[in-house]
Amino acid sequence: MDKFFDKLQAVADRYEELGELLSDPEVISDSQRFMKLSKEMGNIRETVEKYNHYKEVTSQIEENDELLHEKLDDEMNAMVKDDLKNLNAEKDQLEHEITLLMLPKDPNDDKNIIMEIHGAAGGDEASLFAADLFNMYSKYAERQGWQVEVADRNETEVGGFKEIVLIISGDKVYSKLKYESGAHRVQRVPVTESAGRVHTSTATVGVMPEAQDVDIDIDQKDIRTDVFRSSGAGGQHINKTSSAVRMTHLPTGIVVSMQDQRSQQQNRAKAMEILRARVYDYYQSREQNEYDAERKSAVGTGDRSERIRTYNFPQNRVTDHRIGLTLNKLDRVMNGELDEVIDALVLADQAEKMERLTNE
């Protein structure tokens, strides 16, 4: 714990240093540097304020401990002990709050996301489950006050999705939905199953932070763009002009096709938005994989092939395999009531980071 408080003191020292720098005329005259340092100071202000309060509380605890060694009447002794009990409770709470504030911040947490849902193993049933997941996330987003835009979709004849791409915008979307990347398994009796047997199918979900030009610089020379005619479910012809767009990022081989928008220009813009996010995610994931090779994380935010959750319809049960969470309220989860699952994942991630922070 001493190392932890050494880190905390270093943050407090940096805060003081930033205060001095921000009053330096040379820094004030450099607006870009001034804004950068102001942001850094703002990011650690709450941590330093709580740390200062923590030091005041521990000082009061020491004073009360000393008082108890003096000759006090019964009433005074009881008052000091009661005060000490409250101070120790406050100290424990402050330690918890400070530890949370000291956890490494994910720079993408405030971003909007691009979510890709694919029907995987299981044919028509997998595509129908992909549609169910789309509805689940859409309802959850609505509960959060977020906006959902369908960027592209590839429908099947049974009303499911081979693939659907969403852009979800709002407050801290990535911070809550980043844990959804992975393979989602469903166990239920398909509508086409006459014998009433339970089948297992899979859909995969990919969650990427929406990337801006400032996040990643993609050279236009690295992109090959092809245009083709749009087609609907089952090959139905939609557009006689070549409005659909396929973009290939040559250095990574990432391909994005877009045909859901009304014009080639709109498809180009949307394809570029998705491509930027995928390329950003590609390089971020590569860095994360190198990091994870050193520290194995239980609550991952990446590999789409990793089975993360099972939805058992006959037993109305959902299980998140990463944290061993089982809820017997699948009907409510599929209706967008995801808070209990997501909150548990956030807490597990925080606990893991906390343990790492105190052990380092």
Swiss-Prot record:
Classification via SUPFAM superfamilies: Release factor
InterPro entries linked: PCRF, Pep_chain_release_fac_I, Pep_chain_release_fac_I_sf, Prokaryotic/Mito_RF, RF-1
Annotated Gene Ontology cellular component terms: cytoplasm
PROSITE patterns (alphabetical): RF_PROK_I (PS00745)
SMART domains for the chain: PCRF
UniProt-annotated location(s): Cytoplasm
Residues the record lists as N5-methylglutamine modifications: 236
Keywords, ordered alphabetically: Cytoplasm, Methylation, Protein biosynthesis
One Gene Ontology molecular-function label: translation release factor activity, codon specific
Post-translational modification: Methylated by PrmC. Methylation increases the termination efficiency of RF1.
Family according to the record: Belongs to the prokaryotic/mitochondrial release factor family.
HAMAP family documented for this protein: Rel_fac_1
Role according to the record: Peptide chain release factor 1 directs the termination of translation in response to the peptide chain termination codons UAG and UAA.
Alphabetized PANTHER family for the sequence: LD18447P
Name of protein: Peptide chain release factor 1
Lineage of origin: Bacteria, Bacillati, Bacillota, Bacilli, Lactobacillales
Gene: prfA
